[in-house]
Amino acid sequence: MDNIRIHSDFEGGNVKVLRVEDDTVFLQNELRDTLTDWFFWSFCVEGAQGRTLTFTFDKKWVGYFGAAVSRDYENWRWSETRISPYSFTYSFSYDESKVYFAHDMVYSIKNFNTLLSETGIKPDVLCLSRQGREVPLIRIGDGERKIFLTSRHHACESTGTYVLEGFIREYLVSQIENTELIIVPMVDYDGVICGDQGKNRAPYDHNRDYTDSPIYPETSAIISLAKKENVVFAIDFHSPYHLKGINDKVFVVRKYDSKRALFDRFGALLERYCADSDGMRYFLCDDMMPNTGWNADETPTSCSFFSSLSSCHLAFSLETAYFGTEDNKVSTRRLINEGRAVCRALSEYFKSL
């Protein structure tokens, strides 16, 4: 193993190598300032051509289909070599001098730049992050009705950003009448670049920062901007917990039972368009209802903030599984197609407004 390098020295990297025994690498993910146990990891292996290695974590952080694998940290596939919830194996071909592995199919800055290049979108700046980076803001369209879209309130939640990309691509070819998209694709921008968990940061994360005195520049800027706009609809794209149960599904998190009829109407449209899209499947019956499970938490969130705006017809988070199931399996293509279906469903929904 002397000539093999295993590291996280790249944008989005997150791993600690504990030890190496023969062809087995023992690993641990880094929580950093996350206060609770969380699962994201991402690392690179260089110089392992022709070798077969086993990677073993200290906790059960390997998904159903093994690791997400990429040669360029942009195009991903599943390794399909899971040994157990702790470990997976990988056989490096002789032309694989550098391979990236991750908990899930990461949506990186490279993916975002490819989207900008292919669509010609020119982003604005929402604000400067705590670390001095320009946080991207996208505006598309010129209609009076504003649709506010966000993702990566929690830095590690990549599936939601793929879904958001699909929404953007669909909107560009079939815009919703009299609307404008206002998009913050990576709210925790520093966290995305640094490879942080982002969830449950100390003292609290970006999605718990919708208070009268926000501590993060991004949430403060979103609040200020949204209050100036005629926001009629808001979607916050997320990924749920690691796996099992509802975490293997696509679901809407409903905050208010008073809007049940509106959620049902949109959900029925989304279920139909997802079924026709060759994307991740969504079923209305899987929605997380108000005051159930972790949705009983009354801490202010992006959705509670947008719901408080007098102009806002409906606001919710859309959660998309990291892995899915064998019959509803995550891939970058299916995530993007899910996003296209969300846009089509919303276009149909707006016809009744």
What would you call each of these model-derived segments?
Residues M1-D95, V99:
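Extreme N-terminal flexible tails
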Residues W41-F43, L270, V342, L346:
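Short, Φ-rich (hydrophobic/aromatic) sequence segments
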Residues G63-V69, K110-T114, G160:
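A short, polar/proline- and glycine-enriched secondary-structure boundary/capping micro-motif
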Residues Y64, K110-N111, V192, K244, ...:
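Intrinsically disordered, low-complexity acidic/polar segments
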Residues I83-Q131, G141-D142:
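Extended acidic/polar, glycine-enriched regions
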Residues P123-I138, E144-C303, S307-G324:
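Active-site/substrate-binding loop(s) of hydrolase catalytic cores
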Residues T325-L353:
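His/Asp/Glu-rich mid-to-C-terminal helical/loop segments that flank catalytic regions of hydrolases
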